[in-house]
Structure formats: C-alpha cells, structure tokens
Amino acid sequence: MTVRKPEWLKVRILSEDLNRMEAFLKNMALNTVCQSANCPNMGECFARRTATFMIMGNICTRNCRFCAVEKGHPQPLDEEEPRRVAEAARRLGLRHVVVTSVTRDDLPDGGASHFAKTIYELKKLPGVTVEVLVPDFMGNEEAIRTVVEAKPDVINHNVETVPRLYSRVRPKADYIRSLNLLKKVKELDPLILTKSGIMVGLGETEEEVIEVMKDLRDIDCDMMTIGQYLRPSHKHIEVAEYVTPEQFKRYEEIGYKLGFKHVASGPLVRSSYHADVGLSLARG
C-alpha cells in the first residue's frame, strides 16, 4: 500500500532559479547530486546559489535501493574536473563548497585521489571552506588517508539507515565499515569535523535511530543529519511511514543531549542542506 505524502513535504519549485543554475552547470560540464538524486530542496538551494557538486561522473557502481542516481558502468575520470569545480565555485561566489561523488568501486582507490585533487583546487580560493561527502572506499585505509591529507574542513560519510535494514536498503554496504571510516578520519586528523546522516521512514524504530546516534558519538562524530526518505520512483524501496515534524524535533533534541555539535533533523533535511550553517554552528 502506498503511503500518502503529507502537506509538510510539499515544496514550491522556483523554476527561474532552477533553469538558470542548470544552464550554468551544463555550460561548466559539471554534475550535482541535487539533480541526480532529485533533491526536494533543489529549487531553494539553487535560488541561494548553492549546489553540491558530484564528481567522477553520474553513474554509480552500486545499487542502493533508495537512491535515484543511475547505476551501471562509469566513464573514465575527467582529469580537468577538479579545476572546473573550483572555477564554478569561484564564479558562484561560494564560501562553503560541498563535493560528493558516485561510488566508484571500479577504481583502485575508489576515487580518493580525485577527491583530493578537487579539495586542493578549492583550497586555492581565498576564504573558502570545503566539505566532502565520501563513499566508503570499501574500507581502504590508504584511500581514506589520501582524502584526510588534503585537509577538507568537513568529511561526511552517511550511514544512511539503521543496521537491521542494510541488507534491504543498501546491500553492498556495511554499517561497521562506515563507522570505521569516520573513526579513522578522527584518528588521522582530530581537527577535521566529521559528519554522518540517516534517512527515516524506512521501517526503523526510534530506539534503532537512537542507537545509531550513540554509535556515531562513540566514534566522536561531530555532526548529524536526519531526513525523511522520499521514494524516487516505483522501482525504489517503498516509504514505510512519513515521520512527523514533532518526531524530527525529538531526534534533534536527543542528538544534542548525546553531544553532537550540530544536528539538522527535519522532513526535508539532506546531507548538505544548509551545510554552511552547520559548519559555523559546529565550530561555535
């Protein structure tokens, strides 16, 4: 049975801003996760002249059942892409830049060196802070080290859901491997802020969400995002429930009590939604 979408999840799309930003990105030959994942905040973010750049193409090597990004055989890396991302950030006047990627299990380092090159290019821009949302690199510690040594301000890696639902929601991923990545970042450089996020509405319980929060705090994760899972198409896993704004507020309060420096919890919250604000609050 299909669960009806509530009023609090209906958003107005600002088509003029959307069209303008999409034309700019097309001209720069760049992808955003905003477009590839059909993000509900795309109109608002594009109106604010912010976007999350998605590097290493727009085809993923995994088949997570919640994700709208295309699956298949990716193209070779574009060596000029890191420079173009930095140029786009400069032209848009961005002060905080978020970079993510598809998962590239076909590459020896999972694309870590490409992330590092992009971070180095962005760090050339005066006063710019950089946040990266990385895949799990199949647990490759050298790959994680490569990204850490490029010194982004924030390294985000989403655990996405509670452990019980992994086999159904993201069968090629591993909950412990994801926790270990975030733990390794802190071991290598305690000054880098770490961040993770989950979707709710997939059939998890409140107790399971709280356990994930505790697991993240146990590895000194600084920031957390919690948002509603929205089904991209009939091919994707169904929504089990639409979590109320009141429950999201409760998760936020619990997160702060557990010691997170910043918690963004709401129906439309996504990993990089108002990430600049999150960084500022986390730094105090």
Swiss-Prot record:
It catalyses: [[Fe-S] cluster scaffold protein carrying a second [4Fe-4S](2+) cluster] + N(6)-octanoyl-L-lysyl-[protein] + 2 oxidized [2Fe-2S]-[ferredoxin] + 2 S-adenosyl-L-methionine + 4 H(+) = [[Fe-S] cluster scaffold protein] + N(6)-[(R)-dihydrolipoyl]-L-lysyl-[protein] + 4 Fe(3+) + 2 hydrogen sulfide + 2 5'-deoxyadenosine + 2 L-methionine + 2 reduced [2Fe-2S]-[ferredoxin]. Its main location: cytoplasm. InterPro entries: Aldolase_TIM (IPR013785), Elp3/MiaA/NifB-like_rSAM (IPR006638), Lipoyl_synth (IPR003698), rSAM (IPR007197). Gene3D superfamilies: Aldolase class I. The keyword Metal-binding applies. Binds 2 [4Fe-4S] clusters per subunit. One cluster is coordinated with 3 cysteines and an exchangeable S-adenosyl-L-methionine. Residues 46-261 form the Radical SAM core domain. GO terms for cellular component: cytoplasm. Keywords: 4Fe-4S, Cytoplasm, Iron, Iron-sulfur, Metal-binding, S-adenosyl-L-methionine, Transferase. [4Fe-4S] cluster 2 binds at C60, C64, C67. It comes from the Bacteria. Belongs to the radical SAM superfamily. Lipoyl synthase family. This is Lipoyl synthase. It comes from Caldanaerobacter subterraneus subsp. tengcongensis (strain DSM 15242 / JCM 11007 / NBRC 100824 / MB4) (Thermoanaerobacter tengcongensis). The lineage of its organism: Bacteria, Bacillati, Bacillota, Clostridia, Thermoanaerobacterales.
